[in-house]
Amino acid sequence: MCLLIDAGNSRIKWALADTARHFVTSGAFEHASDAPDWSTLPAPRGAWISNVAGDAAAARIDALIEARWPALPRTVVRASAAQCGVTNGYAEPARLGSDRWAGLIGAHAAFADEHLLIATFGTATTLEALRADGHFAGGLIAPGWALMMRSLGMHTAQLPTVSIDAATNLLDELAENDAHAPFAIDTPHALSAGCLQAQAGLIERAWRDLEKAWQAPVRLVLSGGAADAIVRALTVPHTRHDTLVLTGLALIAHSA
């Protein structure tokens, strides 16, 4: 049994896995929220941790583990040149984020023998190009949908700050008015839709460019908290997989 922890900038996701491909239970919590209830969980043989949220998150994770399973062995996952069938094309492999690395490993296992473009929607939107043979060819990083909207609100004098929940409601309203969709006739709707279309445009352009460059079909795989919103703007085929990082961590743990 392995405890898997994926600490992102917005949330900490966790799972208990009894094999490389099966979670016994899982959950998620906000950084500032109450601790997860691990009181009934069986003791794992160790914890495998991907943390891109900094020192404070690392300290909290350590405290949570220590409170439930004192002295439990912990492995902080870092990207390497090659692991679990994936080779790292970064110029400096260790500088690739551990979440992106684990996600690549999870995606390669989930969609074996397929070329992939993996789009993950969180605080940042990341794109990873993964060849069918497991070679990570490189990626792109852009502001996430929420960060785009928040940045416009913070750094312009007259634009509002729109949250994801508010933007989702605004887009529902816009979709009901076919006469204007996808163009808006007021600022909050225009900001919400514009940032959403920017996300979708990035994904679709990258997918088409990759298929052209590789002269082969590429599966577009979507993951992350904002994927539900982005999907509504996409016009290309895609597949959802929302546990890529945890799946990758499970594979890493069971290969140790």
From Swiss-Prot:
E.C. number, please?
Answer: 2.7.1.33
The record ties this protein, via Pfam families, to: Pan_kinase (PF03309)
Fetch the Gene3D superfamilies from UniProt: 3.30.420.40
Q: Cofactor(s) for this protein?
A: NH4(+); K(+)
The metabolic or biological pathway listed in the UniProt record of this protein is:
Cofactor biosynthesis; coenzyme A biosynthesis; CoA from (R)-pantothenate: step 1/5
The highest taxon in the source lineage is Bacteria
Compartments, record wording: Cytoplasm
Q: Which UniProt keywords apply?
A: ATP-binding, Coenzyme A biosynthesis, Cytoplasm, Kinase, Nucleotide-binding, Potassium, Transferase
> Where along the chain is ATP bound?
D6, A7, G8, N9, S10, R11, I12, K13, T123
* Binding, substrate: Y90, G97, S98, D99, R100, T187
- What's the subunit arrangement here? Homodimer.
- Similarity comment: Belongs to the type III pantothenate kinase family.
What does the function comment of this entry state? Catalyzes the phosphorylation of pantothenate (Pan), the first step in CoA biosynthesis.
Q: What is this protein called?
A: Type III pantothenate kinase
Q: Its encoding gene is what? A: coaX
